[in-house]
């Protein structure tokens, strides 16, 4: 698991189960239920690095669409509406992507 040493498998599994239906993803609930919201800044930055698949120092819309698959390869892709809502929630400077500080603020919100 990509998040071994950061998150507990059981918490990740429960978080994924809670949003397995299309349209049910809520980033705030997910970050809390998987345990990321309670982690240190360093752990949140490590998580950002895993989600930032192309290592551009930003999480772009396509990476957000596949967000859940970072936690489990069998997880679903987010719908376009979920992806856009997730991006809007995290993109505080309006540049169309989420930087590490924006991600940390969203996780801790």
Curated annotation (Swiss-Prot):
Source taxonomy: Eukaryota, Metazoa, Chordata, Craniata, Vertebrata
GO molecular function: calcium ion binding
Domain of life of the native organism: Eukaryota
A Pfam family annotated for this UniProt entry: EF-hand_7
Domain EF-hand stretches: 39-74, 78-109
Xref: PROSITE patterns: EF_HAND_1, EF_HAND_2
N-acetylalanine found at: 2
Entry binding sites for Ca(2+) 1: 52, 54, 56, 58, 60, 63
Organism: Gadus chalcogrammus
UniProt protein name: Parvalbumin beta-2
SMART domains tied to this protein: EFh
Gene Ontology CC terms, in alphabetical order: cytoplasm
Binding residues annotated for Ca(2+) 2, in chain numbering: 91, 93, 95, 97, 102
């Amino acid at each position: 698991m990509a998040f071994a040493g950061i998150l507990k498998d059981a918490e990740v599994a429960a978080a994924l189960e809670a949003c397995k239906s299309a349209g049910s993803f809520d980033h705030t609930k997910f970050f809390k239920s998987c345990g990321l919201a309670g982690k240190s800044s360093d752990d949140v930055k490590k998580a950002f690095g895993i989600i930032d698949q192309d290592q551009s120092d930003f999480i772009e819309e396509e990476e957000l669409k596949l967000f859940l698959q970072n936690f489990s390869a069998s997880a679903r892709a987010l719908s376009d509406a979920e992806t856009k809502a997730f991006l809007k929630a995290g993109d505080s400077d309006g540049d169309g992507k989420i930087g590490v500080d924006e991600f940390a603020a969203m996780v801790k919100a």
